[in-house]
């Protein structure tokens, strides 16, 4: 007896210890599942956002809700059971027997839907489920574009931070050189102080780039639904597109005068929001047919057993509402108006798609030419000019103003080039999203 009590106590202690351990480890497990990797590629960022972003979670829940509506719409009405007792003289002094002194009825009734109501109702719900699924795909398309834009914004801020830091380090090297030249009497103290004052502008560039980088990372982490928005994050991808992204066809199409009709036709066939609008048209048309079917009333068939004061019998009945006053005119009018509204929304969506594709094509074409022009005309020349002026300044041939102008010009050229690369790549992703290209990899 004592042994069994002791074993029972040990068992409950183990259960309690396991429960406490699970409660302590659960927050860590949840945090581990929602954590974002320290090193993140663009492909990983898009995958994490599609999985964890609250908007995507809500869209998937909407699909589940639409599936529930479909299941409910496909079900038949439940039968009804009625038990009636009538006529028993409960308040008389000489009461007869209970079973033979009343009218007792047990009856089953089943409502029969007419005019194909259940089929039409199920078709409406199936269209709603398809619209919810396509809506989730469209939400994934938009979130994917937002993540790509936020990721590249952080990469741009990171590149600008590198340019600002490099320029500051170059200024510091020149200041160190001028201190040595001042000690040797080659320059005046005013020139050194002028350079030290000018250094503040480059320091301000570094601080501004730091802030832009932190804000860009926080924006990206928010899209990834990270538990904290100040997490350290190393971005692996750069500003230039890689061949694995599948953007070459879009780049060629943006440069081809005949590429716009092909991309527009693809967008009108593949974009989820266009497909949603078309599915809503089908749903509205089916809903109109359903409302017209509701003009025909349902029939309820009933039958059962009746004991009428000791006599057994069978009861049978048919119930049908008489549509004298209400023939569902309001429901039909509303459904017809919603059908016209669905047609108008489909036309509006197609117009938006045409505008999105054309604007994305314009941006991709302009940004491609912009990058090529900067690479051909300015990038190499700005670096060579800066190097020549820097060497001339070190030799005492060029003055301080020439050096500062060349340094600023090189810094501005680098930042302009980084911005052009950013705009080009983002415009290609915008074109892919406008066309509805699911095969384009991040």
Task: Annotate each predicted stretch with a short phrase.
Residues 100-104, 310-314:
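Residues that define the transmembrane beta-barrel architecture of outer-membrane proteins
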Residues 12-27:
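Bacterial N-terminal signal peptides
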Residues 85-91, 112, 305-309, 322-324, ...:
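Transmembrane beta-strands of outer-membrane beta-barrel pores
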Residues 2-3, 136-266, 367:
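Periplasmic alpha-helical coiled-coil/stalk elements that build and connect Gram-negative outer-membrane
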Residues 58-70, 139, 143-164, 173-175, ...:
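Amphipathic alpha-helical coiled-coil segments
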Residues 31-88, 102, 107-112, 120, ...:
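Bacterial Sec-pathway N-terminal export signals of envelope proteins
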Residues 1-10, 32-34, 416-442:
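Acidic, low-complexity, intrinsically disordered peripheral segments
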Residues 47-57, 64-79, 106-124, 134-141, ...:
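A glycine-/polar-enriched beta->alpha junction
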């Amino acid at each position: 007896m004592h042994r069994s009590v002791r074993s029972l106590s040990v068992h409950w202690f183990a259960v309690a210890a396991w429960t406490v351990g699970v409660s302590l480890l659960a927050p860590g497990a949840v945090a581990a599942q929602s954590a974002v990797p320290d090193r993140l590629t663009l492909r990983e960022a898009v995958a994490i956002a599609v999985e964890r972003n609250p908007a995507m979670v809500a869209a998937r829940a909407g699909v589940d809700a639409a599936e529930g509506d479909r299941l409910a719409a496909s079900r038949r009405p439940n039968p009804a059971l009625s038990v009636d007792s009538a006529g028993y003289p409960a308040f008389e002094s000489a009461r007869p027997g209970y079973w033979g002194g009343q009218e007792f009825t047990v009856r089953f009734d089943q409502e029969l839907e007419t005019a194909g109501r259940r089929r039409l109702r199920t078709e409406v719900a199936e269209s709603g489920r398809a619209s919810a699924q396509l809506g989730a795909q469209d939400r994934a398309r938009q979130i994917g574009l937002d993540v790509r834009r936020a990721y590249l914004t952080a990469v741009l801020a990171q590149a600008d931070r590198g340019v600002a830091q490099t320029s500051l380090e170059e200024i510091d090297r020149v200041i160190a050189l001028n201190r040595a030249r001042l000690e040797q009497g080659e320059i005046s103290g005013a020139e050194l102080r002028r350079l030290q004052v000018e250094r503040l502008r480059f320091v301000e560039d570094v601080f501004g780039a730091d802030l832009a980088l932190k804000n860009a990372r926080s924006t990206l982490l928010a899209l990834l639904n990270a538990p904290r928005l100040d997490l350290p994050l190393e971005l692996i991808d750069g500003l230039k597109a890689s061949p694995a992204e599948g953007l070459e066809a879009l780049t060629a199409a943006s440069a081809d005068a005949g590429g716009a009709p092909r991309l527009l036709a693809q967008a009108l066939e593949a974009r989820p929001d266009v497909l949603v609008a078309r599915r809503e048209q089908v749903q509205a048309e089916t809903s109109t047919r359903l409302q017209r079917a509701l003009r025909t009333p349902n029939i309820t068939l009933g039958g059962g057993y009746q004991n009428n004061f000791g006599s057994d019998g069978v009861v049978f009945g048919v119930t049908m509402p008489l549509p004298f006053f209400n023939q569902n005119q309001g429901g039909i009018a509303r459904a017809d108006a919603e059908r016209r509204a669905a047609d108008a929304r489909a036309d509006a969506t197609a117009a938006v798609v045409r505008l999105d594709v054309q604007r994305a094509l314009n941006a991709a074409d302009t940004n491609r030419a912009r990058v090529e022009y900067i690479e051909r005309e300015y990038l190499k020349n700005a670096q060579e000019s800066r190097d020549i002026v820097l060497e001339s300044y070190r030799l005492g041939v060029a003055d301080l103003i020439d050096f500062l102008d060349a340094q600023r010009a090189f810094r501005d050229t680098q930042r302009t080039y980084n911005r052009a690369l950013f705009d080009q790549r983002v415009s290609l992703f915008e074109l892919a999203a406008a066309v509805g290209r699911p095969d384009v990899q991040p």
